[in-house]
């Protein structure tokens, strides 16, 4: 007699705690075709890091109430995953646990969850709804955003999010990979935009940063290829490395007079950027700050600048550069590969 196979919503259910166990089970089960549901063993307390990473044939995860922790990247890249039920035994969800699960459309966080890591749902391009139990003491949802209640930090956003006015910080990777996000209003309660907060939001075309913001984190808008304009107020004192790298649609950028350092890769690969006016608050242009801005023909370097890092303008189209006497250090190949320009390493004293 053939063994009866358990099903879930019409799919075969396979019990396994990681991808290796899943492969072994599939080898023994003739005729099983994806998609299928995976059931975690009822004796499992923690789903380990990378347990099912990139298992694209999994459509549903059945997690028992013995599980208290979902580890780092446990289900990252499970693009076929459309359904996951997190039981009320789970207290911790690790960094990038469901990263790039593009088939997920909604998530529900129960009242037991006390800690959610960075980028937990980053790159979930299909996500349109976020719900948190009203009884959860650590987190709440508002405007399709998941918010850490005590710190007022927006942890997870999605394509349909509206940032509430209670938020003071947009956390690391909060909107990363939300490719269907075309516009976002940042309220003037926000003081910090975290690392990779809007990275790879390719549908964003413009954004206005309120004058309450003092810091833009590393890679905050990296890879926002559709971004054509951005307004940065004078309140911003720090723009992190690679903050606007790969923003291939930007033609102009205003660097506020409050910034003292243009960090590494800040505007790298901004291929349509044609001119830059660097304010006299800037003292340092770090390595590869404007590398491969292939249409950059003009840059004004003020006499406040003392340092220009390695390959700062490498691969640009600069035809003339006025380097003031204030500059004491020019790094290796700082302007090399610009038409008509050649330069050896120079240290000015």
Predicted regions and their residues:
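Short amphipathic alpha-helical segments that mediate assembly, nucleic-acid/protein binding
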Residues: 19-22
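Short acidic-glycine loop/turn motifs at beta-strand connectors
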Residues: 148-151
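Consensus positions within tandem repeat domains that build extended binding/scaffold surfaces
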Residues: 49-51, 71-74, 94-97, 118-120, ...
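Structural signature of tandem-repeat unit edges
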Residues: 1-17, 32-46, 56-69, 79-92, ...
């Amino acid at each position: 007699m053939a063994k009866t196979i358990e099903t879930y919503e019409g799919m075969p259910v396979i019990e396994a705690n990681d991808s290796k166990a899943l492969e072994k089970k599939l080898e023994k089960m003739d005729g099983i075709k994806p998609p299928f549901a995976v059931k975690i063993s009822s004796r499992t307390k923690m789903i380990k890091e990378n347990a099912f990473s990139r298992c694209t044939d999994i459509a549903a995860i059945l997690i028992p109430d013995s599980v208290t922790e979902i580890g780092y990247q446990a289900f990252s890249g499970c693009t076929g995953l459309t359904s996951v039920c997190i039981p009320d035994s789970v207290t911790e969800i690790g960094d990038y646990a469901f990263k790039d699960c593009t088939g997920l459309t909604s998530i529900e966080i129960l009242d037991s969850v006390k800690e959610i890591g960075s980028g937990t749902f980053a790159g979930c391009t299909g996500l349109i709804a976020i719900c948190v139990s009203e009884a959860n003491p650590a987190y709440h949802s508002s405007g399709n955003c998941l918010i850490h209640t005590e710190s007022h930090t927006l942890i997870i956003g999605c394509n349909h999010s509206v940032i509430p006015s209670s938020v003071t910080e947009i956390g690391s990777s909060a909107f990363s990979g939300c490719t269907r996000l075309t516009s976002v209003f940042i309220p003037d309660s926000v003081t910090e935009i975290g690392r990779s907060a809007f990275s790879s939001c390719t549908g964003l075309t413009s954004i206005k940063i309120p004058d309450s913001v003092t810091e833009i984190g590393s890679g905050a808008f990296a890879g926002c290829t559709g971004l054509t304009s951005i307004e940065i107020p004078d309140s911003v004192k720090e723009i992190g490395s690679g903050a606007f790298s790969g923003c291939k649609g930007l033609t102009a950028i205003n660097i506020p007079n409050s910034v003292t350092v243009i960090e590494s890769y800040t505007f790298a690969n901004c291929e349509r950027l044609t001119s830059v006016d660097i304010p006299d608050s800037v003292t340092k242009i770090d390595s590869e700050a404007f590398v491969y801005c292939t249409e950059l023909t003009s840059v004004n370097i003020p006499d406040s600048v003392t340092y220009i890092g390695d390959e700062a303008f490498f691969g640009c189209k600069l035809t003339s550069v006025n380097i003031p006497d204030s500059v004491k250090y020019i790094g290796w190949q700082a302007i090399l590969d610009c038409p008509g320009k050649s330069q050896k390493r120079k240290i000015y004293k």
